[in-house]
Amino acid sequence: MAPAQRPLLPLLLLLLPLRARNEDPARANADRYAVYWNRSNPRFQVSAVGDGGGYTVEVSINDYLDIYCPHYGAPLPPAERMERYILYMVNGEGHASCDHRQRGFKRWECNRPAAPGGPLKFSEKFQLFTPFSLGFEFRPGHEYYYISATPPNLVDRPCLRLKVYVRPTNETLYEAPEPIFTSNSSCSGLGGCHLFLTTVPVLWSLLGS
């Protein structure tokens, strides 16, 4: 009679969350920061191209940034007066010049100003590691930049700019100045690679026993 096979799924479930256990427990209760992305927001009105400043938010790792798009209730204004924006994530030069072509990429689009359920909301989580194959990873002690542009064929609007500073921590020392774009072909940070390399030999030994 063949020996009974050992169930591997419970073991995998025990091994894979190891990295999550190493995260700072003090950040278990993350903060949320709201940004209302419209030109009537006075925080944006101090932002002039070339001044190097503008709307700034300070966050910590595992915090959330909630972007609220422009929204209009009844009676609705004329369509040409409704604000619509395409939001980009850019580098420092793109933020200073309000030019999304400076290593910028489209992040969100505020294209439903009269949505019946309320304003569109987009959320960014500032995390060291992401479980998603197309997620972004952020580093403490660095700044990240967002700007908006008017969609084509619409009335041009002033550029709105946002700078997010991720506060440094005592436990992490990273030098990556830009958000890391992850894919299925790479490990999400050194912790993920180390976990994978240490887990594989254990699984092979169990399969061969």
From Swiss-Prot:
Q: Which UniProt keywords are present, listed alphabetically?
A: Cell membrane, Disulfide bond, Glycoprotein, GPI-anchor, Lipoprotein, Membrane, Signal
Q: Which GO terms of the molecular function aspect are on file?
A: ephrin receptor binding
Gene Ontology CC annotations of this record: neuromuscular junction; perikaryon; plasma membrane; side of membrane
Source organism superkingdom: Eukaryota
Gene3D superfamilies named in the record: Cupredoxins - blue copper proteins (2.60.40.420)
Q: What is its main location?
A: membrane
Glycosylation site residues = 38, 170, 184
Annotated membrane topology is: Lipid-anchor; GPI-anchor
Q: List the disulfide bonds.
A: 69-110, 98-159
SUPFAM superfamilies found in the cross-reference section:
Cupredoxins
Q: In which tissues is it expressed?
A: Expressed in myogenic progenitor cells.
Propeptide ranges, please? 185-209
Describe the location of the Ephrin RBD domain by residue ranges: 30-170
Q: One of this protein's GO BP terms?
A: ephrin receptor signaling pathway
According to its UniProt record, where is this protein located?
A: Cell membrane
Residues annotated as signal peptide: 1-20
Q: Which PANTHER family match?
A: EPHRIN, EPHRIN-A2
Subunit structure, as described in the record: Binds to the receptor tyrosine kinases EPHA3, EPHA4 and EPHA5. Interacts with EPHA8; activates EPHA8.
Q: Which family does it belong to?
A: Belongs to the ephrin family.
State what this protein does.
Cell surface GPI-bound ligand for Eph receptors, a family of receptor tyrosine kinases which are crucial for migration, repulsion and adhesion during neuronal, vascular and epithelial development. Binds promiscuously Eph receptors residing on adjacent cells, leading to contact-dependent bidirectional signaling into neighboring cells. The signaling pathway downstream of the receptor is referred to as forward signaling while the signaling pathway downstream of the ephrin ligand is referred to as reverse signaling.
What name does UniProt use for this protein? Ephrin-A2
What organism, scientifically named, is this protein from? Mus musculus (Mouse)
The taxonomic lineage of its organism, from the top, reads:
Eukaryota, Metazoa, Chordata, Craniata, Vertebrata
